[in-house]
């Protein structure tokens, strides 16, 4: 709400003063009720009409009304005082009593807890009233906390020091008026005693400190408590959100007793009910009240046993104590017959006298009059913001529809009946979406179509379930189980699987599907359990432990959790994310709110509302309704969702197109929404009927779907979230329409305008970077200048604006042929999409540092990248920074082409200041095929639109790959501790040797199978003569994997020098660039080879050289396909063999079993997936079990821990396996050379750079 409207409707405008004289017998005729001991403001009870006349200045004035809140009595501020103190103040007045009172409203009512749990700008009347309440409460009550006493603190005076259990019991009993967490400790303000202690009330002398405007105050509380109170203050528009510590102003007493000092901003607190959690939605959706105050005041009382509550951000939500549920939506609006938008009258100039309400806007809409940006409208229920009056917009659309219907009706008799279209043809554009099929699906499971009416089936008896029962066992990783749950918000509602998290335990297990009903957890039946109860069960399971789940398949979700027109559903992500603390409760981030906090898909961006055209006109955009998070999320992790669709007479009801970034087919348009329930535009199709289709061409996928008989059911596994799909320039749209008839898109989206998009698509999130500067027709002023985004104005005015994660927009719709035509056209420069997008990121430093690592900058001109993001660190909490981002500036200082050391120094300076402003750029994953004779660029992405992208590739940092053996950083300075090694290949290639091309083709699930060795520590002697120029060739074949495509082709030998990859010269390229070139080549790579000098082969694998196996497996599914290890033995060349001692080769691999000693197992580790390296033995403790066994040595690579492979294993997982293995640990190792690889970056955390562990 803008400041102007807030000022008009603010409660301070309703405050009035009234003087009441006593009667002849001293009676006042005014009854005072409430009081802080009841958790209420003092308020007026019964009033004698004759005595209630206000007499300011001797004349008649306003009267006291029953129910009005008393703010002052005889100049004494009484808010927060118990009733007996208020009566004491009144009794001290002999003849007349002056009251300052205010009528109750939506924000200020008699509930003290409600008012204290709101957040206000410091210095505002609301904030001052909160401080008055607290000051008065402290006169009788001592705040309580769970932290230990500090020096000089007196128990019972400064604080009542309680255990966590005692505190939670106290909160659950309703004794605490205000509760919160600060720095990992609970704080609370209890109610005053119901009776004054020893019969004492506030003395007359003490009243002076309560006089309005008095400079005196109550005894000061300690700093930590004041900090806790101040942390709830809403900042002004110009203040940074990080200016004050984060704080939870309320929490749920039964929501866990996790003792974790790290705090995240809370979403919604419960009010006066410890058993209820507030409705949970994507935390990026921080909106003010869903109804304006004016609407709340005119809707009448709430239904029985309903309660209105407020979050710490002032957001309204509602508690149904009958069903023990919470909701964003006002039940008064749900029960009220809402007037259709088009039937409302224009609200321009229509206002009520008192509250300036817009009478003709439907419930849930709010009109904002901003003095700078003008008028705009907020739909709080469907969460959208627009400039256009929604009533006028609805009338205009209805009029347009009527005109179109009339035109169609006039043309219908003159046109022959069109033939029945094929499911993938353009004829769909004129076909009315068919209704849901009436025929049953082909499988014996219960029908998957949603019930047309009535309450969905529910039972608490598992034997009454009719679907297919599935049993699965999942191990909880450090990031959870990897699935999200919806439901359980109504008394009789199933808890069902909403989606799986990519690469999470549930997705890797492969048994769970969207819609599966959770029947039991560890043999405990949970049918009928609430959402919060089941979440608590999952959260109580320790990391590393397993859970047995019984699921029932056959009951579809009774609602679409992504549909903005349905009620928001409380959901908690039991997913593969780091746990965070919200309201004292361990929970996990949402996959939808966090396109991937860990940066697994490194090209995801936080999304912000774009232009008003995106907000208002394009209804395919809106706010994310993936209600799957309890705390601030940072990016959206890809979800795997199962959708069942029955093929109807007109087909499946959706169209597909090539994914612009490669990786398969995306859903381009939903033609038949009822039939495609659960499917969304932009979804990437991973499997069709359990068959992976990411490697198939567009036509192959279309043929597969066409072959399905009508009436049969197809099961689609789709990936939602992940790589963003850039928008096309408007200049390219005519080209798309022109060529759409001959394209392979099979899409009709070109025939849809911005204003006719289906409302069901509005759950997609607005992109952060707006498209080209083209405003929508109805979003421009008379001068043609684009208006600012109304949502941004509104959200900033509420001091709640923050970034939103980006969901994928629908596929851009360009087929391969169209993209080729676009590129070769003269308009290419106008429609070209930039390769990079830049972003400024401001970070506050935490106690543990900025929480990210810096990589690169070791060679002149080498880019500097963001490496590992520390979970729960400053960068992770902020959420915008991603692993792989290229660093452009640090606090305004450009660092492009600068050294690693300079960036380290800049970061150290920033650490002293406590904050840093980073400018980063992120590559847009959208590439177009090169012209036929054009040389590919090493920075290009996949060259084939049909090439499936391996998501494991996205985990690597740009300067090296996951496949690197030792180090991925360039320069000899990064190889310290590895050894200098012997001389490189020194043979000179004769001038008579001619280069030749070798083409290697690989299968779907295999790598190319060769190793490139790049000499970086000294100049190479191998040369060739090209154009009389002597060119060094530092890159050569180091290994060939037996049985691999490189081995089968028979044209490569160890020692061969590589001149070019896919026609691109690599003589001056870094090792990582070559690795990326080959990875991006798809299934075929062409190498230009000069036969090598075999005399140099014996020194190819020295430690000073960088080695990387080019065996990237472009797996269509990320579940179970791993990259080939670099430890594979090379196939001995026909003229060369390794001649190492036989005894050494026998000991290359060995197993040890260690028994835990008094100080652990006596060794420490280095490496892990998060550091882009394998696991190595870093140190051996003197006289420890590892040293005493006599086999283990520093530098040995750990291949298995307790039988579990370490391939792609995280460092934390390795420690977890060792710690949870009991008294013994069994290790399978490969003998190293005594050196341990260094990490490839600098660490900006105040934790050990190399998290070695001596378990």
Curated annotation (Swiss-Prot):
Domain PDZ, first and last residues per copy: 17-105, 471-553, 642-720, 840-922, 997-1093, 1151-1233
Q: Which PROSITE patterns match?
A: GUANYLATE_KINASE_1 (PS00856), GUANYLATE_KINASE_2 (PS50052), PDZ (PS50106), WW_DOMAIN_1 (PS01159), WW_DOMAIN_2 (PS50020)
The biased composition feature labelled Pro residues covers 434-444
Span-the-membrane segments of this chain are: none
**Residues reported to bind ATP:** 103-110
Q: Name one GO biological process term.
A: positive regulation of cell-cell adhesion
What segments bear the compositional bias annotation Polar residues? 585-601, 938-950, 958-967, 1111-1129
Q: Where do Low complexity bias regions lie?
A: 402-414, 741-755
* Region named Disordered: 208-227, 235-265, 395-462, 585-622, 719-820, 932-984, 1111-1142
Modification Phosphoserine, positions: 357, 729, 740, 799, 1070
Q: How does it assemble?
A: Part of a complex composed of AMOTL2, MAGI1 and CDH5, within the complex AMOTL2 acts as a scaffold protein for the interaction of MAGI1 with CDH5. The complex is required for coupling actin fibers to cell junctions in endothelial cells. Interacts through its WW 2 domain with SYNPO and through its PDZ 5 domain with ACTN4. Interacts with cytoplasmic domain of ADGRB1. Interacts via its WW domains with DRPLA. Interacts with ESAM, LRP2 and CXADR. May interact with CTNNB1. Interacts through its PDZ 1 domain with NET1. Interacts with ASIC3 and AMOT. Interacts with FCHSD2.
The protein's name is Membrane-associated guanylate kinase, WW and PDZ domain-containing protein 1
Organism annotation: Rattus norvegicus (Rat)
Q: What is the lineage of its organism?
A: Eukaryota, Metazoa, Chordata, Craniata, Vertebrata
């Amino acid at each position: 709400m803008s400041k102007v409207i807030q000022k008009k409707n603010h409660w301070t405008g309703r405050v009035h003063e009234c003087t009441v004289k006593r009667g002849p017998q001293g009676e006042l005729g005014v009854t005072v009720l409430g009081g802080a001991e009841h958790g209420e403001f003092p308020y007026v009870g019964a009033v004698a009409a004759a005595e209630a006349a206000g007499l300011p200045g001797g004349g008649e004035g306003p009267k006291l009304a029953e129910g009005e809140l008393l703010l002052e009595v005889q100049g004494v501020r009484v808010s927060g005082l118990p009733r007996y103190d208020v009566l004491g103040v009144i009794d001290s007045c002999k003849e007349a009593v002056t009251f300052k009172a205010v009528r109750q409203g939506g924000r200020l009512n008699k509930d003290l807890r409600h008012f204290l749990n709101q957040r206000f700008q410091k210095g505002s009347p609301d904030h001052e009233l909160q401080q008055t309440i607290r000051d008065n409460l402290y006169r009788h009550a001592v705040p309580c906390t769970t932290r230990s006493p500090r020096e000089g603190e007196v128990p019972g005076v400064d604080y009542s020091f309680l255990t966590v259990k005692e505190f939670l019991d106290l909160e659950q009993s309703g004794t605490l008026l205000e509760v919160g967490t600060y720095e990992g400790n609970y704080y609370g303000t209890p109610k005053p005693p119901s009776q004054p202690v020893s019969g004492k009330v506030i003395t007359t002398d003490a009243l002076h400190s309560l006089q309005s405007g008095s400079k005196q105050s109550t005894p000061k509380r300690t700093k930590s408590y004041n900090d806790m109170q101040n942390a709830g203050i809403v900042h002004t528009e110009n203040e940074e959100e990080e200016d004050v510590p984060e704080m939870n102003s309320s929490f749920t007493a039964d929501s866990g007793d996790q003792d974790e000092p790290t705090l995240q901003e809370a979403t919604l607190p419960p009010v006066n009910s410890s058993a209820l959690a507030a409705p949970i939605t994507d935390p990026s959706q921080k909106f003010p009240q869903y109804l304006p105050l004016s609407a709340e005041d005119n809707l009448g009382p709430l239904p029985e046993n309903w309660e209105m509550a407020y979050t710490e951000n002032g957001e309204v939500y509602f508690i149904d104590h009958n069903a023990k549920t919470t909701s964003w939506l006002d039940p008064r609006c749900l029960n009220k017959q809402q007037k259709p938008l088009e039937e409302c009258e224009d609200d321009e100039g229509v206002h009520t006298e008192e509250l300036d309400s817009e009478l003709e806007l439907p419930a849930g809409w709010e009109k904002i009059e901003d003095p700078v940006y003008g008028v705009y409208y907020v739909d709080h229920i469907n969460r959208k913001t627009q400039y256009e009056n929604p009533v006028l917009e609805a009338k205009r659309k209805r009029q347009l529809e009527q005109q179109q219907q009339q035109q169609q009706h006039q043309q219908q008799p003159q046109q022959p009946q069109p033939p029945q279209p094929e499911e993938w043809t353009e004829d769909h554009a004129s076909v009315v979406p068919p209704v849901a099929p009436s025929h049953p699906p082909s499988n014996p499971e219960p029908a998957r179509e949603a019930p047309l009416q009535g309450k969905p089936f529910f039972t608490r008896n598992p034997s009454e379930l009719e679907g297919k029962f599935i049993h699965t066992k999942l191990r909880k990783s450090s990031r959870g189980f990897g699935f999200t749950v919806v439901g359980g918000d109504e008394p009789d509602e199933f808890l069902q699987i909403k989606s799986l998290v990519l690469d999470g335990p549930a997705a890797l297990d492969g048994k769970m599907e969207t819609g599966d009903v959770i029947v039991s957890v560890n043999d405990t039946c949970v049918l009928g359990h609430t959402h919060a109860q089941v979440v608590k069960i999952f959260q109580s399971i320790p990391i590393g432990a397993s859970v047995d789940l019984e699921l029932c398949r056959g009951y579809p979700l009774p609602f679409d959790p992504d549909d903005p027109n349905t009620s928001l559903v409380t959901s908690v992500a039991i997913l593969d994310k780091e746990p965070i603390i919200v309201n004292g409760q361990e929970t996990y981030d949402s996959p939808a709110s966090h396109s991937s906090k860990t940066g697994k898909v490194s090209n995801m961006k936080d999304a912000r509302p774009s232009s008003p055209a995106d907000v208002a006109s394009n209804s395919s955009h809106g706010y994310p309704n993936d209600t799957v998070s309890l705390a601030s999320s940072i990016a959206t992790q890809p979800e795997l969702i199962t959708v069942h669709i029955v093929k109807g007479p007109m087909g499946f009801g959706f169209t597909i197109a090539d994914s612009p970034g490669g990786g398969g087919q995306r859903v381009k348009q939903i033609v038949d929404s009822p039939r495609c329930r659960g499917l969304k535009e932009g979804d990437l199709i991973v499997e069709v009927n359990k068959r992976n289709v990411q490697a198939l061409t567009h036509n192959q996928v279309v043929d597969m779907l066409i072959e399905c008989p009508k009436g049969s059911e197809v099961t689609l596994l789709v990936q939602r979230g992940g790589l963003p799909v850039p928008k096309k320039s408007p200049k390219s749209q005519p080209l798309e329409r022109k060529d759409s008839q001959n394209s392979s898109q099979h899409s009709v989206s070109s025939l849809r305008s911005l204003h006719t998009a289906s409302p069901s698509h509005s759950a997609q999130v607005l992109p952060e970077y707006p498209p080209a500067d083209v405003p929508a027709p109805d979003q421009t002023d008379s001068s043609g200048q684009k208006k600012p985004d109304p949502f941004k104005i509104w959200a900033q005015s509420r001091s709640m604006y923050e970034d939103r994660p980006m969901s994928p927009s629908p596929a851009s719709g360009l087929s391969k042929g169209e993209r080729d035509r676009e590129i070769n056209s003269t308009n290419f420069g106008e429609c070209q999409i930039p390769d990079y997008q830049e972003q400024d990121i401001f970070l506050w430093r935490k106690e543990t540092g900025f929480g990210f690592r810096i990589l690169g900058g070791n060679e002149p001109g080498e880019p500097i990248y963001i490496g590992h993001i520390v979970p729960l660190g400053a960068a992770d909490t902020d959420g915008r920074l991603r692993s792989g981002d290229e660093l452009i500036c640090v606090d305004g200082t450009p660092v492009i082409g600068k050294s690693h050391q300079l960036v380290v120094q800049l970061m150290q300076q920033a650490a002293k200041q406590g904050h840093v402003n980073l400018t980063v750029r992120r590559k847009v994953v959208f590439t177009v095929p090169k012209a036929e004779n054009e040389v590919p660029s090493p920075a290009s992405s996949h060259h084939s639109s049909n090439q499936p992208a391996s998501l494991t590739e996205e985990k690597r940092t740009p300067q090296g790959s996951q496949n690197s053996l030792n180090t991925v950083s360039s320069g000899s300075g990064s190889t310290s501790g590895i050894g200098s090694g012997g001389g490189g290949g020194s043979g000179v290639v004769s001038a008579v040797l001619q280069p030749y091309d070798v083409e290697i083709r690989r299968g779907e699930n295999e790598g190319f199978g060769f190793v490139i060795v790049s000499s970086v520590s000294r100049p190479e002697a191998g040369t060739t003569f090209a154009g009389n120029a002597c060119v060094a060739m530092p890159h050569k074949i180091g290994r060939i994997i037996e049985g691999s495509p490189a081995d089968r082709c028979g044209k490569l030998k160890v020692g061969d020098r590589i001149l070019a990859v896919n026609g691109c010269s690599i003589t001056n390229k870094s090792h990582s660039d070559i690795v990326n070139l080959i990875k991006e080549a798809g299934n075929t790579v062409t190498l230009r080879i000069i036969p090598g000098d075999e005399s140099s082969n014996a020194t190819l694998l020295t430690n000073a050289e960088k080695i990387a196996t080019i065996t990237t497996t472009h797996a269509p599914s990320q579940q179970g396909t791993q990259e080939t290890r670099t430890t594979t033995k090379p196939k001995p060349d026909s003229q060369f063999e390794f001649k190492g001692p036989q005894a050494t080769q026998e000991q290359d691999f060995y197993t040890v079993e260690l028994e835990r000693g008094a100080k652990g197992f006596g060794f420490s580790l280095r490496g892990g997936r998060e550091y882009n390296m394998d696991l190595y033995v870093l140190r051996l403790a003197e006289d420890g079990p590892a040293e005493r066994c006599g086999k283990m040595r520093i530098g040995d690579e750990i291949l298995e821990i307790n039988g579990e492979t370490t391939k792609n294993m995280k460092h934390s997982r390795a420690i977890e396996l060792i710690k949870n293995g009991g008294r013994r640990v069994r290790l399978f190792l490969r003998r190293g050379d005594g050196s341990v690889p260094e990490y490839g970056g600098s660490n900006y955390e105040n934790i050990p750079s190399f998290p070695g562990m001596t378990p």
